[in-house]
Amino acid sequence: MQYIFLSHDVDWRRQGPPVEHVLERKDRFDSEIFANTKPENLYRNIPKYMELEERFGIRSTFFFRTVYENGNLSDYEDDIQSLLKGNWEIGLHTDPQSVNDIEKIRQEKEKLESLTKTPIIGNRVHFLNYNSELPIKLKKLGFVYDASLRYSKNKIDEKEMGHSKIDGVIEFPVTLMDAYLFTHMGINEEGIIPEFKKTIEIGRNFSDVNVISVIWHDNVLKMKGGRMYEKILEFLTSQDDVKILPGKDLVKILK
């Protein structure tokens, strides 16, 4: 079985980035969508992700930051509650400045748990700012898994899939991420599904029981490239030996 650990990093405040930021990236959007969508809604896609995943009968993990530039985590409270009620998972998207300080990570975890009212067991550091001392800190704080590790920005091979246990924490390398596909690997929209097919084949050749970790950022769904998400789900759910899971369900199988 090829297990897909499907997740979304919520990088921007609930109100979206500053208008200047959006205008500078106008060409990332179809002109009609850009013209007919309020700037603050161009990056807002959590409800649409939920709708799509519900349609395909799957669930994923949403990693929320606790430090948003000119915004607050509490602005996402309604989204977080909706996700939890629908059996999606909430994980911590740790601030890069916190990774060397266990107390800062603890404070972030507790801040997120004050909204979820349930323990947070999954972590991913913003910008994948991983270091070798991180797992032991996460273990002490009650995390079960981390998904911050990536060896290369421009290639996908066996090193970028599977899982390992480091200092008592399950580590999932990042296999496929929208930003790396488009920016570092130069994959265009037409090449996205073929790249997923190729990655699944690498996984099948690597191991009969394997994990492929996918990040599709919450803000890209209306963008060129990012809008292929529905087609990605269509392809993945058509494969008999592929199962899509949030991190919390995946670790139960791997334990």
Place the predicted regions along the sequence by residue:
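Active-site beta->alpha N-cap acidic-glycine motif
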Residues: 1-82
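Active-site-adjacent pocket scaffolds in enzyme catalytic domains
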Residues: 5, 114-208
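Well-ordered, non-membrane alpha-helical segments in soluble/globular domains
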Residues: 42-49, 74-77, 105-106, 190-200, ...
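Metal-dependent polysaccharide deacetylase catalytic core of the NodB/CE4 family, i.e.
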Residues: 47-50, 54-136, 149, 173-181, ...
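Helix C-cap/helix->beta junction micro-motif
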Residues: 56, 86, 141, 206, ...
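Histidine/acidic-residue-rich catalytic or RNA/ligand-binding cores of hydrolases
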Residues: 101-106, 133-137, 158-161, 224-231, ...
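C-terminal domain-boundary segment and adjacent tail
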Residues: 197-255
